[in-house]
């Protein structure tokens, strides 16, 4: 329900503004219709001296009003609230600042998963499951603060690093290096995509920009809870206009289709005769991620002898860097999302810093380059 902030909200905002002036740090807004949840999140955030709560709101309408007067770096957003609701309010929240990042705090229900994935596709950067009663423990606090810390860091350093990687006086690389066009003379068999925090929005933008004529199989490893994967697959199918499925052990990799890594195992690929098939492995990886991008790219490097085009989108950490290095050694080509459009320039930044990325660009430009790099199907 719309209206002026309640006395409690106004008092909290004034208090947090004074606190922000003293402490500085990552500015956090908490939006949830539950007073209990708002109070718990406030205590957790304020336990970190690098963060300050600039406001709390019991509705999306109140949050939008407060954000216009007290901008935040990170907004913790509940989607299921009376009135406007978090999903409907998301575009307006994102419009309050060019730099604001939204962390969706979602429920474990089917509706909660669908709304969360819709929010991530619209521009929310990351998600965190809201625990059941008694679940707001130290582990949860550590995970929450880690996500806020990653999202709230100033991107200026990342953008500056990207500028150093780019040619002097020019933008980030806008095309293949000399001699690398068509993957050093070989048509790729697969387009492989790795993504994490902020990657779903970027993935949607990139897939929508690929024309129907693009016929390569598309493999996607996205860091998400396994319970979200069926909803994620359905939403990707709608956004891309391509048949999309979760890759089980032994699933054939088919042209023009999208295969998504299951949330409880890594998607790997092996060759059986002339065909490629998916394998599922749950072995621990150095990145600690499940699913991990590294085994997908490393297995493709071997199965396709380097005939792979890989794209690393927005994400926290370094997952994908080792696999990208293996793929590059085998003759494959790697693209990376740029820092300015990434929610977190961790995964693409790691690839760029290692000088593995032929192209560093926004998602739509990556799609253009993919279609320019991959020729029409060869006559058989």
Regions found by a protein language model. Give the residues of each.
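Conserved acid/base catalytic micro-environments in cytosolic active-site loops
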Residues: 2-30, 34-50, 56, 61-62, ...
């Amino acid at each position: 329900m719309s209206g002026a902030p309640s006395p409690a909200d106004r008092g909290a905002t004034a208090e947090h503004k004074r606190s922000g002036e003293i402490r500085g740090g990552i500015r956090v807004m908490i939006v949830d219709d539950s007073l209990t949840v708002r109070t718990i999140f406030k205590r957790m955030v304020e336990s970190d001296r690098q963060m300050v709560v600039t406001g709390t709101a019991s509705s999306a309408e109140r949050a939008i009003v407060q954000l216009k007067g007290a901008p935040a770096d990170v907004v913790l957003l509940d989607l299921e609230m009376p009135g406007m609701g978090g999903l409907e309010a998301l575009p307006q929240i994102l419009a309050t600042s060019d730099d604001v990042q939204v962390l969706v705090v979602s429920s474990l229900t089917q509706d909660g998963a669908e709304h969360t994935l819709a929010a991530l596709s619209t521009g929310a950067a990351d998600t965190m499951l809201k625990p059941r009663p008694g679940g707001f423990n130290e582990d949860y606090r550590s995970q929450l603060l880690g996500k806020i810390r990653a999202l709230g860091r100033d991107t200026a350093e990342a953008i500056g690093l990207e500028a150093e990687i780019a040619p002097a006086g020019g933008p980030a690389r806008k095309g293949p290096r000399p001699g690398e066009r068509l993957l050093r003379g070989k048509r790729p068999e697969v387009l492989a995509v790795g993504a994490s925090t902020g990657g779903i929005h970027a993935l949607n933008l990139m897939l929508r920009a690929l024309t129907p004529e693009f016929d390569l199989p598309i493999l996607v490893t996205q860091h998400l809870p396994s319970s979200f994967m069926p909803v994620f697959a359905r939403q990707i199918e709608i956004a891309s206009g391509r048949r999309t499925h979760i890759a089980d052990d032994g699933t054939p990799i088919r042209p023009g289709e999208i295969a998504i890594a299951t949330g409880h195992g890594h998607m790997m690929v092996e060759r059986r005769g002339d065909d490629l098939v998916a394998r599922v492995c749950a072995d621990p990886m150095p990145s600690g991620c499940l699913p991990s991008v590294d085994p997908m790219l490393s297995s493709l490097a071997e199965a396709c002898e380097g005939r792979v085009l890989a794209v690393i989108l927005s994400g926290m950490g370094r997952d994908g860097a080792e696999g990208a290095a293996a793929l590059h050694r085998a003759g494959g080509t790697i693209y990376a999302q740029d820092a300015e459009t990434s929610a977190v320039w961790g995964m693409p930044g790691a690839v760029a810093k290692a000088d593995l990325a032929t192209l560093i660009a926004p998602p739509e430009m990556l799609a253009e380059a993919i279609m320019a790099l991959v020729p029409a199907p060869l006559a058989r």
